[in-house]
A protein has these predicted regions:
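N-terminal active-site segment of His-dependent metallophosphoesterases
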Residues: 1-45, 126, 130-134
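Conserved catalytic scaffold of divalent metal-dependent phosphoesterases
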Residues: 5-13, 55, 59-61, 66-156
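Active-site neighborhood of phospho(di)ester-bond hydrolases with catalytic His/Asp-centered motifs
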Residues: 5-7, 28-34, 51-57, 79, ...
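Active-site environment of divalent metal-dependent phosphoester hydrolases
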Residues: 10-14, 35-41, 57-64, 98-104, ...
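Short, conserved loop/helix-junction motifs that constitute active-site signature segments
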Residues: 23-24, 44-48, 71-73, 131, ...
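Binuclear metal-dependent phosphoesterase catalytic core
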Residues: 83-87, 162-168, 180-209
Length: 209
């Protein structure tokens, strides 16, 4: 399965006809938040593949343009607190990050983040019984605690995500939120059976499932 994952930064060539020259044969797109909805719509319109997304803390509740208002990328599938099936893949997600101000969108307290994760648990347990595995791809905006995160509260990782990774062992965990400015920054870390990937900007990955 070949995946284009995006987050946090608009990449000029992905928002131009050049996308068709540089991105080939992807099966789906994963968006990890803090991206304009129109940008995500453009990508799936050009590539003609499904897009699965979560929102980030800088995403608007409503986005406006000449075509009216949108509350999500049209044609995309929201993964927040949901388990979704695409062909033989099992995906689930959690949006947002740690709450750092009262008025911010898509921010959660520690307790709320645990509840977001626990909302996924019943169906993941059923999947384990039915399919022998609970989850293939976990999609979030924030990182797990201590993995690709930063010391400030806004960018600190989410402990509930570490628990989900340990208990349900998805093959991959895609996240964004933490910007990457240095070439030597670690963006992929194996945690038990899960490869955690910071997809800041974009990545194209051939997944082994």
């Amino acid at each position: 399965v070949k995946i284009l994952s995006v987050s946090d930064k608009v990449i000029p060539f992905l928002y131009s006809p050049e996308i068709l020259e540089k991105i080939h044969d992807v099966d789906l797109v994963i968006a990890c938040g803090d991206l304009p909805y129109y940008y995500q719509e453009y990508i799936i319109k050009k590539l003609r593949v499904p897009l699965f997304f979560v929102r980030g803390n800088h995403d608007p509740v409503v986005e406006y343009d000449a075509n009216g208002e949108r509350k999500a990328p049209r044609g995309g599938k929201d993964l927040h607190r949901r388990v979704v099936y695409q062909d033989e893949l099992i995906l689930a997600g959690v949006e947002g990050c740690n709450r750092y101000n009262r008025q911010g969108n898509f921010q959660y307290t520690t307790a709320e983040m645990w509840m977001n994760v626990f909302r996924l648990v019943p169906e993941l347990l059923i999947n384990r019984l039915l399919y022998g595995r609970a989850l293939d791809i976990f999609v979030t905006h924030a990182a797990p605690l201590g993995i690709h995160d930063k010391p400030d509260w806004t960018h600190r990782g989410i402990k509930a995500f570490n628990w989900l990774i340990r208990v349900f062992k998805p093959k991959y965990h895609f996240h964004g939120h933490n910007h990457v400015y240095k070439l030597d920054t670690i963006t992929e870390t194996q945690v038990g059976e899960t490869l955690v990937i910071n997809t800041y900007g974009y990545k194209v990955k051939d997944l082994e499932l």
